[in-house]
Amino acid sequence: MALHIHEACILLLVIPGLVTSAAISHEDYPADEGDQISSNDNLIFDDYRGKGCVDDSGFVYKLGERFFPGHSNCPCVCALDGPVCDQPECPKIHPKCTKVEHNGCCPECKEVKNFCEYHGKNYKILEEFKPSPCEWCRCEPSNEVHCVVADCAVPECVNPVYEPEQCCPVCKNGPNCFAGTTIIPAGIEVKVDECNICHCHNGDWWKPAQCSKRECQGKQTV
């Protein structure tokens, strides 16, 4: 007949001078003989139900004691019916987090996005760039790109042109206006035909030219 471990302890206690009663206490979580669980004739395991809790490493905890069952588990309290574990209120994960680890009770952000993505390209935080001649953009700390479009002045001509790498249109021939279908320069009087002399309104290039009729040689004045 196999000798139980706790029976051996009891025999030792009755031998004077060898083992005192202080050698085994309630701190050692003794299990009753009837609570021992045997998987075969050679192995005997103590059953701690109602007396304590055991973690993944085999450590025993008292009733009411707080402990972590495993590395990735949340804290638990040892109760009569076994560990009672509650999920704590975990910190919020950063919305720009690109790498989250779940090795502990709460998920933990290990890497936060530190760049901006704009039209398929990545830019560093606070980096300024020009995606087009008319745009000035910057990568903000919020990982968002803010852009400003150039505020171009109204050209003082009716035929502005766009030069390469320039955002705003320019008047290559200076200010002008329309005299009928003819473009005339501003600031001077221009004879547009045999009978009409025209000039642009000062500063009002979008208005049609002001024209005056003169006597025409060989033609009747309209």
From Swiss-Prot:
Record keywords, A-Z: Developmental protein, Repeat, Secreted, Signal, Synapse
Subcellular location per the Swiss-Prot or TrEMBL entry: Secreted; Synapse
Residues in the signal sequence: 1-21
Major subcellular location class: secreted
GO biological process, one term: positive regulation of neuron differentiation
VWFC domain sequence ranges: 51-110, 114-172
Cross-referenced InterPro entries: VWC2/VWC2L, VWF_dom
Keyword flag Plastid: no
SMART domains: VWC
GO CC annotations on file: AMPA glutamate receptor complex; extracellular space; synapse
Keyword Disulfide bond: no
Subunit-level organization: Peripherally associated with AMPAR complex. AMPAR complex consists of an inner core made of 4 pore-forming GluA/GRIA proteins (GRIA1, GRIA2, GRIA3 and GRIA4) and 4 major auxiliary subunits arranged in a twofold symmetry. One of the two pairs of distinct binding sites is occupied either by CNIH2, CNIH3 or CACNG2, CACNG3. The other harbors CACNG2, CACNG3, CACNG4, CACNG8 or GSG1L. This inner core of AMPAR complex is complemented by outer core constituents binding directly to the GluA/GRIA proteins at sites distinct from the interaction sites of the inner core constituents.
Its biological purpose: May play a role in neurogenesis. May play a role in bone differentiation and matrix mineralization.
Name used for this protein in its record: von Willebrand factor C domain-containing protein 2-like
Organism of this sequence: Homo sapiens
Record gene name: VWC2L
